[in-house]
């Protein structure tokens, strides 16, 4: 520990131990914080001996600062410790860690301003086609072959995909109409697309002439003429006129106007080269959500719509056209979820790991339900029990403490029990079952009588014996043949 604690000594160590960890807090820096910082530097593959000097602390700060946004709490604590130690080495008094960080930010801002001022003093930037020479005159600097080569390479590799438009905008920054025409003329193939671009430029030039008519009369001395549509397109204007328009006071940005026309035509070409509609972009069953989002926004860039419409497409169609697994997750996030939250939530959906996890969760729910049912914790619909003796709920009649009710528990009448009660027990004819054990009225009361004449009336059959004749006479004395007593018990014709 001795070697690690040798970072500070004497008066510097006393100043170190007077600095508070937090504004208004009681805890202060101690020697153990320097020991911890040395160990952390070794863990981050940095030399702990850098803590002993001002320049060493500055190098550590320069290494750790870019990682603060995504770093851990240990990394931030190490940065705060080194920043505080940086001011102790310079014998500059700070009260707490926050004051040390504020002073460090002020110092970095002053250094950055000096650097920018030094670059400005060296001369005008050479990144734009129109530059100022040593005599103070605005002159034109032609596009470099490197810029033209980059543009041609983009067209050859990407054809007219949506990313061509921002690439063209970046390469033509500050260009004159003559420079823009040079870039368009370097495109060898895709002549059909270039003809479409020329038609769009001619339409916009005609619209410009209609909105900006020529002033009547001669041009006053010392003034330049107003540019026409063909002048903006670079066909009827010279390079010097274009520079004059772009550098006059107030300036007429003919280069930016022409660039806007070209981008409008490129949008139409991109739309033609990307025939897929945003409505047709759907996520496959096993397609990762990240790849689906890439395809979605690639086609969205080619859509000819305002930014508000594109935002609506992103909020609605991105969720609607996802596969069922991702759509369930995205709807659970709500409508205010960011794209980062969506991609984080759907990461790994559709793969074998996700399917195994879903299956495990389903099996876990089934197992938990079975365990709860076995333990008697299943909360189903409880059956309400009611006492037939007192009429109250919560107990049965055999457990009732009230006096025993006489008679039937169902209808309240005496003379029969509840099992023999006919209350609300009617047959399908609407009549109650009789209390006696007779058959209901819709059943046969007795064996039906045959209505056919006797066999001897036809002159064939067995010989009639005296006993058989006596039996037939007894049957003739029975009820009339037209009686309905065989079917219904109370026949009015039999009375």
Curated annotation (Swiss-Prot):
Region listing for Interaction with membrane phosphatidylinositol 4,5-bisphosphate and RNA, in residue ranges: 14-33
Alphabetically ordered keywords of this record: AIDS, Capsid protein, Host cell membrane, Host cytoplasm, Host endosome, Host membrane, Host nucleus, Host-virus interaction, Lipoprotein, Membrane, Metal-binding, Methylation, Myristate, Phosphoprotein, Repeat, RNA-binding, Viral budding, Viral budding via the host ESCRT complexes, Viral nucleoprotein, Viral release from host cell, Virion, Zinc, Zinc-finger
Region (PPIA/CYPA-binding loop): 213-221
PROSITE patterns (UniProt xref): ZF_CCHC (PS50158)
Stretch list, region Interaction with host PPIA/CYPA and NUP153: 185-223
PTM notes: Gag-Pol polyprotein: Specific enzymatic cleavages by the viral protease yield mature proteins.
Region (Dimerization/Multimerization of capsid protein p24): 273-359
Annotated site residue numbers, Cleavage: 128-129, 359-360, 372-373, 427-428, 443-444
Region Interaction with membrane phosphatidylinositol 4,5-bisphosphate: start-end pairs: 73-77
Region (Interaction with Gp41): 7-31
Zinc finger (CCHC-type): 385-402, 406-423
UniProt region (Interaction with host CALM1), positions on chain: 8-43
Residue span of motif Nuclear localization signal: 26-32
UniProt GO molecular function: RNA binding; structural molecule activity; zinc ion binding
Residue ranges of the motif Nuclear export signal: 16-22
Positions where lipid (N-myristoyl glycine) attaches: 2
GO biological process: viral budding via host ESCRT complex; viral translational frameshifting
UniProt short sequence motif PTAP/PSAP motif, positions renumbered to this chain: 450-453
UniProt modified residues of type Asymmetric dimethylarginine: 382, 404
Note: HIV-1 lineages are divided in three main groups, M (for Major), O (for Outlier), and N (for New, or Non-M, Non-O). The vast majority of strains found worldwide belong to the group M. Group O seems to be endemic to and largely confined to Cameroon and neighboring countries in West Central Africa, where these viruses represent a small minority of HIV-1 strains. The group N is represented by a limited number of isolates from Cameroonian persons. The group M is further subdivided in 9 clades or subtypes (A to D, F to H, J and K).
This protein's domain notes: Late-budding domains (L domains) are short sequence motifs essential for viral particle budding. They recruit proteins of the host ESCRT machinery (Endosomal Sorting Complex Required for Transport) or ESCRT-associated proteins. p6-gag contains two L domains: a PTAP/PSAP motif, which interacts with the UEV domain of TSG101 and a LYPX(n)L motif which interacts with PDCD6IP/AIP1.
Descriptive protein name: Gag polyprotein
Gene this protein is translated from: gag
């Amino acid at each position: 520990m001795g070697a690690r604690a040798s970072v500070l000594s004497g008066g510097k160590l006393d100043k170190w131990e007077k600095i508070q960890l937090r504004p208004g807090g009681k805890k202060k820096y101690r020697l153990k914080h320097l020991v911890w910082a040395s160990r952390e530097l070794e863990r981050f593959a940095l030399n702990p001996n850098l803590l002993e000097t001002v320049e060493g602390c500055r190098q550590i700060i320069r290494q750790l600062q870019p990682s603060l946004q995504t770093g851990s709490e240990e990394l931030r604590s190490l940065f705060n410790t080194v920043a505080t130690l940086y001011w102790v080495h310079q014998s500059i008094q700070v009260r707490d860690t926050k004051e040390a960080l504020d002073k460090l930010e002020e110092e970095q801002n002053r250094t950055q301003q000096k650097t920018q001022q030094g670059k400005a003093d060296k001369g005008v930037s050479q990144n734009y086609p129109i530059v100022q020479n040593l005599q103070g005159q605005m002159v034109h600097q032609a596009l470099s072959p490197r810029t033209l080569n980059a543009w041609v390479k983009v067209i050859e590799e990407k054809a007219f995909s949506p990313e061509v438009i921002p690439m063209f905008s970046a390469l033509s920054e500050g260009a004159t109409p003559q420079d823009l025409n040079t870039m368009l003329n370097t495109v060898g193939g895709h002549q059909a697309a270039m003809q479409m671009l020329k038609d769009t430029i001619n339409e916009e030039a005609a619209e410009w002439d209609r909105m900006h008519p020529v002033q009547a009369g001669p041009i006053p001395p010392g003034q330049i003429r107003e540019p026409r549509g063909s002048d903006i397109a670079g066909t009827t204007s010279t390079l010097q006129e274009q520079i004059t328009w772009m550098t006059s006071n107030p300036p007429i940005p003919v280069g930016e106007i022409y660039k806007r026309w070209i981008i409008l035509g490129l949008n139409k070409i991109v739309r033609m080269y990307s025939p897929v509609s945003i409505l047709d972009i759907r996520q496959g069953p096993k397609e990762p959500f990240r790849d689906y989002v890439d395809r979605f926004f690639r086609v969205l860039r080619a859509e000819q719509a305002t930014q508000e419409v594109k935002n609506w497409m992103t909020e609605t169609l991105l969720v609607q056209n996802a596969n069922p697994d991702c759509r369930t997750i995205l709807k659970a996030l709500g409508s205010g979820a960011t794209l980062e939250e969506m991609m984080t939530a759907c990461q790994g959906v559709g793969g074998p790991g996700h399917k195994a996890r879903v299956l495990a969760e389903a099996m876990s729910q089934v197992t938990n339900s079975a365990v709860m049912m076995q333990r008697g914790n299943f909360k189903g619909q409880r059956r309400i029990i009611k006492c037939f003796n007192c009429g109250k709920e919560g107990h049965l009649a055999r457990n009732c403490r009230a006096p025993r009710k006489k008679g039937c528990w169902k209808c309240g009448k005496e003379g029969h029990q509840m099992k023999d009660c006919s209350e609300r027990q009617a047959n399908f004819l609407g009549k109650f079952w009789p209390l006696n054990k007779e058959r209901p009225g819709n059943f046969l009361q007795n064996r039906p009588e045959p209505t056919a004449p006797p066999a001897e009336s036809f002159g064939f059959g067995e010989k009639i014996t005296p006993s058989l004749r006596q039996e037939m006479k007894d049957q003739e004395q029975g009820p009339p043949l037209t009686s309905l007593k065989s079917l219904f018990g109370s026949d009015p014709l039999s009375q």
